[in-house]
Regions:
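Structural signal for hydrophobic packing residues in well-ordered secondary-structure cores
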Residues: 9-11, 18-29, 57, 61, ...
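A glycine-rich phosphate-binding loop feature that marks nucleotide/adenosyl-phosphate handling sites
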Residues: 2-4, 34-42, 84-95, 148-154, ...
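Flexible inter-domain linker/hinge segments
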Residues: 8-87, 91-99, 104-110
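Short helix/loop capping segments that flank catalytic or ligand/cofactor-binding pockets
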Residues: 4, 11-14, 61-63, 94-96, ...
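Conserved N-terminal alpha-helix of the aminotransferase class I/II PLP-enzyme fold
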Residues: 43, 63-64, 108-149, 154
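Short acidic (Asp/Glu) and glycine-rich catalytic loops that position anionic groups and cofactors
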Residues: 43-51, 79-80, 106-114, 136-140, ...
Length: 311
């Protein structure tokens, strides 16, 4: 298991944890040799030697009020959810209301001890269990894991599941991952990290996946195809009219379809990924649901999978 520590943790807390573990496994603790640095020191090569904050903007405004007005003038140039719907294709955002975010600050939710016994975490367990069932129903896939701490980790976990499936079947050649140009930008990085070779699929003039180009690549690599990663609707903001046909093509050669959930907010309640051919997808709970956008984390990027890819 792993233990997460933050800036509030101290030397005594760490030694208490080590003592607890030592007693648990019935071994004597030897903490004398453990040394803790009291301060963090940057290597000299990492220290900046040139002058900083030399731009005029840092000397033009001499008072807090002047600087505040300058910052707000810059902010007025932005178009955000405060002004209207955001035409941003890579992530379908919405406003997460304060009423929905407020419970995150409750100590009963945010300050539970990681070693709390099960009989003291029944409420927390029910929240997770209920959310697992709801997400499974929303996306139309059998199982859900909350282990990934971000959407990018959800991508990685889903692709690892696909890779592990093929390895368990002895199909070690299935290392090709098809990714359309219209897919979310993180997809190629996740695929490479998971051990796949990326093949780029072209798009037509209207932003759809070029089905002819996809067909040519599928036919060429056939039993080497491991997965197709797509974003639906795409980063161009386009709902692929041939989505079922695309999924069927990948399945016909034994591959899996991975859906990037960045734009899932645009289809929740209208359709389910599992119903139109998706085998595994992740969800960004800060986009589709209402956990905070940033703020130091950790976030949640749950990944959902079909029965075939479930543990």
């Amino acid at each position: 298991f792993g233990i997460s520590l933050d800036e509030l943790s101290n030397e005594k807390e760490i030694k208490d944890i080590l003592t607890f573990i030592a007693n648990l496994i019935e071994k004597e603790e030897d903490l004398e040799h453990i040394k803790f640095d009291k301060e963090f020191h940057l290597e000299s090569l990492a220290l900046r030697s040139s002058a900083w904050m030399q731009q005029d903007i840092f000397t033009n405004y001499q008072s807090e009020t002047e600087l505040m007005r300058y910052i707000f003038r810059l902010a007025e140039k932005d178009f955000s959810l405060v002004d209207g719907m955001m035409p941003l294709g890579s992530c379908t955002m919405k406003l997460n209301s304060a009423a929905e975010l407020n419970p995150v600050s409750w100590a009963n939710l945010s300050s539970m001890h990681p070693f709390s016994p099960p009989d003291q975490t029944k409420g927390y367990s029910k929240i997770i269990s209920d959310l697992e069932k709801w997400i499974s129903e929303i996306v139309g896939l059998k199982s859900v894991s909350f282990q990934p701490n971000a959407g990018s980790q959800g991508e990685f976990a889903g692709l690892l599941a696909i890779n592990s499936y093929f390895e368990s079947k002895g199909e070690l050649l299935r290392k090709k991952c098809l990714i359309p140009k219209s897919a979310h930008g993180t997809n190629p990085a996740s695929a490479v990290m998971a051990g796949f070779d990326v093949l780029t699929v072209e798009c037509d003039d209207e932003g759809n996946i070029d089905y002819q180009d996809l067909s040519i690549k599928v036919k060429k690599f056939d039993n080497q195809i491991g997965a197709l990663m797509l974003t639906y609707p795409s980063t161009h903001g386009v709902f692929e009219l041939q989505i079922r046909k695309i999924c069927d093509l990948i399945h016909s050669v034994g591959g899996f379809v991975y859906l990037d959930g960045a734009n899932l907010n645009a289809q929740v309640g209208l359709c389910k990924p599992g119903n139109y051919g998706v085998d595994v997808c992740h969800l960004n709970l800060h986009k589709t649901f209402c956990i905070p956008h940033g703020g130091g984390g950790p976030g949640v990027g749950p990944v959902a999978a079909s029965e075939t890819l479930s543990p």
